[in-house]
């Protein structure tokens, strides 16, 4: 049974990738991911804010009340464990890439041109097989237009591609007015992969203390449908690889991602809940499902239910919204 896939120009033995998580903090835990059989690993992110803290002489530690730390806030490390700055991150990345054989993807989380363009080359020089950049920006300025935010993102992607030679994945937010258009622009700017989606955390209000506080939860497959919809819509319409991250909790979730067109499936919460060996469950279940449907490889399944190929493309559009609403009813008195 062929589970081999291509992602970011790399041939992987199967589509399951360990996403950015605390397993990336230490060399021995990355080795555990490799030994368990993950196809690749995304290292934990280097955050723009922690770099600026170092430069300003303040302690480089993430503030758990700062909602900008969208990706890793729930895995808040102890101060003694935190990677303080770009050079320490690069040194750790260098050691990891020399110690394991699976591809190691560096990760950069920022929102300004300076941070992306300054630190992307460092990650490449450290030996990363690819770079994943995470775009996170909350535009609170009512004078800033949607077009301006989109142009800023696209220009930064284009600039990074001009600086580094390793493949570039862009982890996007779903909160764009016309997401398909933005994804197409990022694709045309040179992104080698689109990762759907960055997981944002919303502020919570503590009515006792009257403060804004974080509420941190691991993702569940309730978050998956949004990712499935947009992967299905983009499949066959962009040249970039597609990866789904967030909401893949079970083998069936991974199969769904492949059916809508995902080339790779990133998993974090499931690894934290079940341990690195859970990848064996994912692989075995995928093999059994392919065999049950008389498919020799995942290539036969990938994109079978994409927007372009499905017999019912309206399922990804407004028609499904109406149908879903009418699927519920209340018995007559």
Where are these regions (language model features)?
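C-terminal extensions of enzymes
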Residues: 274-294, 298-333
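A compact, surface-exposed functional segment
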Residues: 255-287
């Amino acid at each position: 049974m062929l589970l081999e896939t291509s992602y970011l120009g790399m041939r992987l033995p199967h589509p399951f990738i360990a996403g950015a998580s605390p397993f990336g903090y230490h060399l021995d835990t990355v080795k555990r991911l490799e030994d368990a059989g993950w196809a690749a690993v995304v290292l934990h992110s280097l955050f723009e804010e922690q770099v600026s803290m170092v430069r300003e002489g303040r302690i480089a530690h993430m503030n758990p009340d700062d909602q900008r730390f969208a990706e890793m806030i729930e895995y808040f490390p102890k101060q003694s464990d935190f990677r303080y700055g770009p050079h320490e991150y690069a040194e750790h990345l260098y050691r990891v890439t020399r110690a394991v054989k699976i591809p190691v993807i560096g990760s950069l989380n920022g929102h300004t041109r300076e941070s992306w363009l300054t630190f992307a080359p460092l990650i490449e020089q450290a030996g990363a097989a690819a770079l994943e950049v995470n775009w996170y920006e909350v535009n609170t300025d009512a004078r800033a237009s949607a077009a301006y935010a989109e142009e800023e993102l696209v220009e930064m992607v284009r600039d990074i591609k001009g600086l580094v030679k390793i493949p570039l994945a862009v982890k996007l937010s779903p909160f764009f007015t016309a997401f398909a258009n933005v994804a197409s622009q990022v694709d045309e700017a040179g992104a080698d992969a689109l990762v759907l989606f960055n997981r944002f955390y919303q502020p919570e209000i503590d009515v006792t203390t009257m403060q804004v506080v974080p509420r941190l939860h691991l993702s569940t497959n309730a978050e998956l449908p949004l990712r499935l919809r947009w992967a299905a819509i983009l499949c066959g319409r962009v040249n970039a690889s597609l990866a789904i991250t967030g909401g893949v909790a079970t083998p069936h979730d991974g199969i769904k991602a492949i059916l809508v067109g995902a080339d790779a499936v990133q998993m974090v919460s499931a690894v934290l809940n079940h341990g690195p060996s859970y990848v064996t469950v994912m692989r075995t279940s995928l093999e059994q499902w392919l065999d049950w449907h008389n498919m020799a490889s995942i290539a036969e399944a990938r994109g079978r239910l994409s927007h372009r190929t499905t017999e019912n493309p309206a399922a990804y559009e407004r028609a499904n919204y109406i149908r879903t609403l009418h699927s519920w009813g209340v018995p007559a008195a």
